[in-house]
Regions:
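Short beta-strand->loop micro-motif that forms the acidic, two-metal-ion catalytic signature
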Residues: 124-127
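Right-hand nucleic-acid polymerase module
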Residues: 1-120, 131-287
Length: 287
């Protein structure tokens, strides 16, 4: 078994005053550093769980570090495209977006997570920005009443090429960012052999979190910020407008208390405001 010395804590800046604190778990050596097990010794189940965790982390990063206009739900009409071949759909969708960038003269960006129906067909959920106002329009009859009443928009170019879609203007960026991570499921991760790398896909370039600091001595205030437990680490998302880096880490405890506030979704957030079929998906076990 091989091991390497790793930090006890790591802090990443997401922008807009948002930071992620990570406290790593493991066995301490006499010098208070952590020893972490090499990936080569991990079981397949552990690796799959790690893939799932990494994918969720990256989706949340992209969701929080970039500005988005709409929550997007896109389906695939069997008469227009093969709904069962995700690779072909992703390739065609990427080319479709490149074509629309030229048509609209706009830098369209997207972050999308595929979801599989029980019959094996695919559809997608995600975030999108850069669509000009004249590319989208309100739903009109005979569209379902919930789409018209809910203020959802149609992207006709997508609908003509692939099938039904809906766009919901984003009103709560934090809650929407956390909501989209729910579609990165462990079941999707375990089907990785069938879908390759496509736990999610996105346009380029997108901004990612930037490492602000590594801390190699245990720090109690940082540890207490980490409220999410995982197999190998604990994490916490916080607001800290005045949390300036590089910070004074001369000792194991900070010189002064810095006011930090947890980044959490609004408990009153209603998913049906961005996902018109939320209740149906929930009943079918997708959420």
């Amino acid at each position: 078994m091989t091991s390497s010395v790793s930090p006890v804590h790591s802090i990443h800046e997401y922008g807009n005053g948002i930071y992620k604190v990570v406290t790593f778990k493991g066995n301490r050596d006499p010098d208070n550093a952590y020893l972490r097990t090499s990936e080569a010794t991990q079981s397949n189940d552990t690796k799959l769980d790690n893939n799932f965790s990494r994918a969720r982390n990256m989706v949340l990063q992209y969701a929080l570090c970039n500005s988005w206009d709409y929550f997007f739900t896109g389906t695939i009409d069997r008469a227009k495209f093969d709904r069962f071949i995700l690779d072909a759909y992703q390739s065609r969708l990427s080319q479709f977006v490149r074509d629309k960038r030229k048509k609209y003269q706009s830098q369209i960006q997207y972050l999308l997570v595929p979801e599989q129906h029980k019959d094996g067909a695919w559809h997608i959920h995600g975030l999108i920005s850069g669509l000009p106002e004249d590319a989208v329009s309100p739903f009109v009859p005979p569209a379902p009443q919930r789409l018209m009443d809910g203020g959802f928009l149609n992207w006709s170019d997508y609908m003509d090429t692939f099938g039904f879609c809906s766009l919901a203007p984003i009103r709560d960026a934090i809650a929407t960012a956390y909501y989209i991570t729910k579609y990165v499921s462990k079941d999707l991760s375990r089907r990785q052999a069938d879908i390759g790398k496509h736990l999610y896909f996105h346009s380029r370039p997108l901004r990612k979190a930037v490492k602000a600091s590594d801390v190699y001595l245990y720090n109690r205030p940082l540890d207490e910020l980490c409220v999410n437990e995982y197999d190998f680490c604990k994490t916490g998302m916080v607001y800290g407008e005045d949390w300036i880096w590089p910070y004074d880490w001369a000792g194991a405890e900070p010189a002064e208390v810095i006011p930090l506030y947890p980044v959490v979704p609004d408990p009153d957030f209603q998913p049906m405001t961005i996902e018109p079929d939320f209740q149906q998906l929930k009943m079918e076990g997708y959420l």
